[in-house]
Amino acid sequence: MAEFILAGAKAVQIYIDPADTNYKGIRIAAEAFAGDVELVTGKKPELVDAAEKVTGPVIVVGTMKQNPLIAKAAEAGTLNLSEIDGKWECYVTKLADTVLYIAGSDKRGCIYGIYRLSEMIGVSPWVWFADVAPEKKEELKFTAEELDCVSKEPSVKYRGIFINDESPSFT
């Protein structure tokens, strides 16, 4: 059974291609995820933006038609992107040897894939909003069965938070 160690003796690298038109948003989410890993283990993943800098286990993050490593994996048959092609805010996560791919159908899909990993390591979105501290762990290790996933399209296309500013209870 294939296992992927996110953080053990050291943390994995996270590769984001700077040529991806969604680079800025994806990088922000990847930095947040690296911070989450550090919060849980004390070891921070290194973000790399050049394929030549990758040394060892890596998380390759990007949108499906913008990241050359994701495109290469799809061409080789390692990664099946047909299930998210043309869909709204979807992602695929796939473990292949020492590479964990997170491929989004679009920028938001990719970001949701990154935050799914944060959820898997035990970090709540409330860590920032309400200081909910995650459980500390020495090692973060997952099997391919736990990591491999194809998300569904959201049932509501446009969603958000409405703040009632007519009678706010913020004071």
Which residue stretches match the model-derived regions?
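Feature activates predominantly on carbohydrate-active enzymes
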Residues: 32, 79-171
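Acidic, contiguous N-terminal accessory segments
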Residues: 1-92, 146-147
